[in-house]
Every structure is written in structure tokens, then in C-alpha cells.
Amino acid sequence: MFKRMIIPIIACLFTAAVGYAAQGQGWIGTPVEAKQMVEKAIIYLLGNGPNKALEEFNRPNGKFQWRDLYVFACDPTGVVAAHPDAKLIGRNMYEVPDVQGKPFWKEIVDLANSRGSGWVDYQYLDRITGQEAFKITYFKKVGDLIICCGAYLP
């Protein structure tokens, strides 16, 4: 009986170790890295203009999609201008809540319009794992765009 149990136990420990190592090696972006992505996106936006910047933000596996981090953007009313999920582009997300009912888009837009930048936390479907997870997003308003990037929290 011990021999039958040892293989599944070793498999579980190996799986946990691989997952832990992946986090330790930086496969999961951090809030600091999310903020850095926003700052990098703003530099690109200011240097190349909004049309080219939005095109680059929307490019699959482009400069602004790294690990599990990605830049997304909306206008001051909540209409999405850039997002890895192309179905969201052009859609007004202002009233759309997170999976727990929190109006996080509204919070991002309102704070960006009143303060210019900040952080908002919410629960979101992780596009890599397919599971609900806590996320914190940094955003900054530049002209008529709100540039955002969020990191999933452990």
C-alpha cells in the first residue's frame, strides 16, 4: 500500500515545486512590474502618437504583453481602446463589474479623471489559468487615454 501512495505523493510535490519555482523565476508579473509597463507604454505613446501606440498595445505577444502582464487602455468615458481580448475593443465597460459585482472599470475611469493615476483592486478571470483571481491594476491618464496594467495577486 505504501508503494501505491508514494508515486502520487511525489507527483504532487513535484507539481507544487514546479509551480513555486515558476513564481520564483518571475513567470507571474508583480504590481511594481505592472506600473513599469504603464510607464513604458506612456513613453511609447508620447513618442509615437496614439494611433501607433494603440496598434502596438493590441499586438498579440507584442512589446506590451509580457509574462501574464498586458497593457490595456480606455478613453475617459470607459470605451476600451486597447486590450488583448479584441472583443472588448470599442465596448463601453464603465458599468461592467468584476466577478464579485464591484464596478472596477467605473472606479478606474473616475479616479483617472479626478486624480490622474492610481491603483484599483478587483477580481478578474485570469486569461492564462482560466480561474478567478485577485488583481490590482495601476492606471494613469495621458491626454484622452487611460493606460492600465494589472498584476494578479498570490
Predicted segments, located by residue:
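N-terminal membrane-sensor/transducer module of prokaryotic signaling receptors
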Residues: 2, 7-9, 13-154
